[in-house]
A protein has these predicted regions:
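Surface-exposed, charge/polar-rich loops and edge strands
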Residues: 1-288, 293-380
Length: 380
């Protein structure tokens, strides 16, 4: 399929620059996969729109202050006798670093700008010299591998020096409010460089109402990284290669998913990150088990390749596009995504491309708010 098949026009005025207040006041577009019909609603109505026996899977990753501003270290700046203030005067050109994936305690993959002339061995200083990064090598997709050095643990330095990595279509700098609002209420596992935005609409009150209705809620962890916002450069989408993202599925969650599948209870994924983790784990489990069983890929029901989910840590570079089966997920809660993006293509694979683009056209006409801080869809 061609990338142009997933384009739509969006007025800039509909790109949300701030979140809705309160969280659950966001609008929600309900889309039925089987018929393509839609209905306008609000997120606060979610508990009333569900059957009550769903398994809701959420992403508990926490966004870190992954955006850093520093300077390249000049030759004169390498004199260890210089004070931080004097040393700052000898730093050369400014550098912006966007962390994308943690490799170890002090090593990260990162996007660096400008990075074209940043060779291996180059050093970058942040703040008054309390944090440094050394360029180890180039990784895939044009990112650099960095090793950080500092007197304090890296997490503490990031909290002090880093900025919340708001997406580029939010045309402002981050502020103190974003440190709370660009996190979901489920967030407790640090490591993401973007929020799992479908989770931003939940409140403790909504969670309590869902549980009172009989909805079971479990968690996965997927540290959102470069794979989420990496653009597609090939005209044919099948040629795109996703950047790997780490995820973890607990024993409790794996068994809950398997039990729900056996009992034919709907599995509702809160966001595309949950979809990628569950669907990748199902494929890995099926491959480990041997020959695949027959796949039923009827529209409106999940394909039953494998109801087995292996718990543990893994990496996913799964790219879901139309024609591929969904093995686990039955329903999807998701925000509105950028044109021609991997996320829009994933949702098109789940909902049907024509269904989704018609629903998006309605959302534009009805002035829904788009992207990370915008409104959402419930697709079932």
């Amino acid at each position: 399929m061609r990338l142009d098949d997933f384009h739509y026009d969006l007025p800039k005025r509909l790109i949300a620059q701030r979140p809705s207040e309160p969280r659950d006041s966001s609008r929600m577009l309900l889309l039925e996969r089987s018929s393509g019909e839609w209905q306008d609603s609000t997120f606060s109505a979610l508990p009333d729109l569900l059957r009550g026996d769903e398994l809701l899977v959420v992403n508990n990753t926490r966004v870190i202050p992954a955006r850093l501003f520093g300077h390249r270290v000049g030759v004169r700046a390498q004199n260890p006798g210089k004070s931080p203030k004097t040393r700052r005067e000898h730093l050369s050109s400014p550098i912006e670093v966007m962390l994308t994936r943690r490799l170890s305690e002090n090593e990260w993959e990162a996007l660096v700008r400008p990075g074209r002339k940043l060779p291996t061995g180059e050093r970058i200083v942040f703040g008054e010299g309390e944090l440094e990064a050394e360029v180890l090598d180039r990784a895939e997709f044009g990112v650099r591998r960095l090793r950080f050095h500092g007197a304090a643990p890296l997490e503490q330095s990031l909290e002090r020096l880093g900025h919340i990595p708001l997406p580029p279509y939010i045309a402002r700098e981050d502020d103190p409010a974003d440190h709370e609002r660009y996190q979901t209420i489920f967030a407790h596992e640090p490591g993401a460089v973007a929020a799992p935005t479908a989770g931003l609409h939940f409140t403790p009150e909504i969670v309590a109402r869902l549980r009172a209705r009989g909805v079971e809620i479990v968690e996965i962890t997927l540290a959102v990284g470069l794979g989420t916002f990496q653009p597609i450069h090939s005209e044919e989408i099948e040629g795109h290669v996703m950047h790997a993202e780490s995820y973890e599925i607990s024993e409790v969650t794996a068994r809950a998913v398997e039990k729900a599948k056996r009992e034919r209870r709907p599995i509702l994924a809160a966001g595309t990150t949950v979809v990628r983790a569950l669907e990748d784990a199902a494929r890995k489990s099926a491959a480990h088990a041997g020959p695949q069983v027959a796949v039923s890929a009827t529209r409106g029901a999940s394909a039953q390749l494998s109801a087995r989910i292996e718990p543990g840590r893994a990496e996913a570079n799964l790219f879901l596009y139309p024609g591929q089966p969904f093995l686990i997920v039955d329903q999807l809660l998701t925000n509105f995504h950028l044109p021609s993006s991997t996320l829009l293509i994933l949702v098109s694979a789940f909902a049907g491309r024509e269904n989704l683009l018609r629903a998006y056209a309605h959302a534009v006409e009805a002035n829904y708010r788009f992207y990370s801080y915008g409104d959402c869809m419930l697709i079932r």
